């Protein structure tokens, strides 16, 4: 069997290089350990591109593991969940078309801004009224564009909304998209306009295989003690392109605690400072996963 560990940022490369050095020197495993230095975690996902290029055809493996540092966990801790770790990420764009005109004569127009406002409000009812409260979903509008910033008395012809949907379950994801299409079409029509919803599924949910997640937790417990291992880490509504690899191979994605959240230096913050002291633990986890997954014959 082969084990693989994915990385995309500088610190994760350092973690993998440390693991590679130890595994090459000790050879305390029977098999091949594949270390994946994945580019382009952000954007449209380097993991998917690597899979499309035949990653697992060139480097077959039976299981795959990845880690990500986590400011919300104290240094020297490991966090994992035997099921969902991160949500699916969808992008949507709503193009609204009305009839432009003078702001002093709105009755002669079909105002796309008014339609946009109604759609924004209605979309928030999907989570509160259509999603089972025992499930999780997010519908967020990140951008609204209409008219010219300096045109105080011009009602534009068009407006555009851009946002994201986050879900864990595919059935919830499909229901949210269906309800969005129904609401967008009906609301625009009710005001005399039209609207087109462009819905794109970017990242699937990051779902750990219970067997492999439990192995991570067991190894971490032996290594750093059960008091430093969170086995039921609360899933994040953020997204991760390692999810594509977990769709192809069983495995697990876990968190490497690094601290710093209390000071506000969280991920994607310009003042973020990676805690170099946690690198050895990350390397040790990957080494132990390779050795435990591919033990030497007695």
Where is each model-derived feature located?
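Single conserved hydrophobic/aromatic residue that forms the stacking wall/gate
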Residues: 1-7, 11
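Short alpha-helix boundary/capping segments
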Residues: 8, 104-112, 274-282
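Buried hydrophobic packing segments
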Residues: 12-23, 116-119, 123, 283-290
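Acidic/histidine-rich catalytic neighborhood of metal-dependent amide-processing enzymes
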Residues: 14-82, 132, 146-149
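Divalent metal-coordination and catalytic microenvironments
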Residues: 35, 50, 102, 116, ...
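Midchain, well-structured core segments that form catalytic/ion-binding scaffolds
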Residues: 59-208, 235-237, 243
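Short, low-order "capping/linker" segments at domain edges
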Residues: 206-219, 223
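Zn-dependent metallopeptidase/amidohydrolase metal-coordination segment
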Residues: 226, 230-296
């Amino acid at each position: 069997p082969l084990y693989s560990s994915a990385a995309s940022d500088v610190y994760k490369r350092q973690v993998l290089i440390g693991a590679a050095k130890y595994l090459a020197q000790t050879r305390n495993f029977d098999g091949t350990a594949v270390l994946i230095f994945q580019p382009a975690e952000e954007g449209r996902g380097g993991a998917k591109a690597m899979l499309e290029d035949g990653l697992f055809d060139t480097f077959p493996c039976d299981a795959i593991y990845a880690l990500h540092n986590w400011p919300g966990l104290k240094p020297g801790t490991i966090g994992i969940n035997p099921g969902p770790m991160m949500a699916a990420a969808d992008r949507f764009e709503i193009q609204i078309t009305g009839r432009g005109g003078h702001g002093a004569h709105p009755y002669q127009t079909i105002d796309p801004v008014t339609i946009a406002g109604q759609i924004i409000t209605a979309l928030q009812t999907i989570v509160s009224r259509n999603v089972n409260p025992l499930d999780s979903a997010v519908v967020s509008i990140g951008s609204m564009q209409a008219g010219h910033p300096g045109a105080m008395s011009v009602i534009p012809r068009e407006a555009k909304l851009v946002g994201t949907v986050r879900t864990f379950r595919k059935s919830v994801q499909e229901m949210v998209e269906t309800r969005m299409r129904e609401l967008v079409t009906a609301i625009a029509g009710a005001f005399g306009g039209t609207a087109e919803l462009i819905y794109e599924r970017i990242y699937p949910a990051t779902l750990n295989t219970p067997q492999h997640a439990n192995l991570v937790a067991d190894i971490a417990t032996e290594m750093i003690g059960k008091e430093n291992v969170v086995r039921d880490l609360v899933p994040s509504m953020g997204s991760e392109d390692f999810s594509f690899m977990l769709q192809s191979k069983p495995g697990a994605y876990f968190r490497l605690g690094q601290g710093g959240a209390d000071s506000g230096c969280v991920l994607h913050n310009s003042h973020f400072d990676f805690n170099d002291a946690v690198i050895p633990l990350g390397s040790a986890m990957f080494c132990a996963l390779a050795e435990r997954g591919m033990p030497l014959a007695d």
